[in-house]
Structures are given as C-alpha cells and as structure tokens.
Amino acid sequence: MLTLPEYNEQIPNVRSLLTKWAKVERIQDVQDGLQLDVRLKTDTLLELHIYYDHVYHVPSIKFRLWSLDTEEDISSLRLLTLSDSELRSILNLGTFSVTLSTDMEMKSVYYYINNCDTDANVGSDVEHYLTRWISLYIRIFDLNFVP
C-alpha cells in the first residue's frame, strides 16, 4: 500500500519513465495520475489512465483500446472489446484480470486492471514502489517496455 502523498511524490518518476516509451504519443498530468495516448500498432490506439485508488491505496490502471478503421478516405475509431480477438492478441494479461466498468465521473466505460494483488506483485517497500509497479503492469500492453 502507498499513501496518497507517497504516490504523488513518486508519480513524476513514472512520468519520466513513460516519456521514454517510444509508443507514447501524448502524456498528460491529471488529478492523482497520468493519462496517455499510446500507439500500439499503426491502427491501434491505447487510451491509458494511471490513477491512485483511494479505496485500496495502490496505483491503478484503467484503459480503452481503439481500432482505427478507414473506409473510402473516412477514418473512425472503434472501441475494442474483450470479445474482439484483436484486443486479446494485444494484451499480455498473464495472471492479471480485467473487468469492464463505468467511470461515473467521466460517464464512460473502461477496462480496469484488477489491483487486489498489487502489493503481492510489487512488494510493500515504499521506496521506488511506483517504478516497480509500472515496470510490471505496463508489460500488459508492451512486453518490450524497459524502464
């Protein structure tokens, strides 16, 4: 577990690591976290939100994957769902689980990475907690990510 002040102290380090990720097109600071647009493939965009979970006191991820469809010079984005084989082929979930839920504040649907086992996966040592966390969890989206 990580207190909000500890999280806020470490989030600039995560931002610094993610700016080195070649696939990031945009990174924005938001309240208690970061929002990224990541080009996973030529026609696949990852909308990624890193935020502090005030209930579990751990960093968390919510995301959406979009497929860029172009037909007769008209482009549109299509939200990918877990039933899309395209989405399942992109995610490297391993033992991680995701759930689909509505973000009431944003009035939008997102996938959430289950954060119940965060401390077991990352360890409870506060020093460099977020660096260890991002190094593990970002690999869900890019196995080649190296912090």
Swiss-Prot record:
Annotated catalytic residues: C116
Disruption outcome: Impairs the formation of preautophagosomal structures.
Cell compartment(s), UniProt: Preautophagosomal structure membrane
Alphabetized InterPro entries for the sequence: Atg3/Atg10
GO molecular function: ubiquitin-like protein transferase activity
Signal peptide location: none
Enzymatic class: transferase
EC number(s) given by UniProt: 2.3.2.-
Membrane topology reported for the UniProt record: Peripheral membrane protein
Gene Ontology BP term (one): autophagy
Protein family per UniProt: Belongs to the ATG10 family.
Further facts: Kluyveromyces marxianus proteins are shorter in length and have a more ordered secondary structure than their S.cerevisiae counterparts, which might contribute to the superior thermotolerance and solubility. K.marxianus could be therefore useful as a new model organism for further elucidation of the molecular details of autophagy.
Subunit structure comment from the entry: Forms homooligomers. Interacts with ATG10. Interacts with ATG7 and ATG12.
Protein name: Ubiquitin-like-conjugating enzyme ATG10
Organism placement in taxonomy: Eukaryota, Fungi, Dikarya, Ascomycota, Saccharomycotina
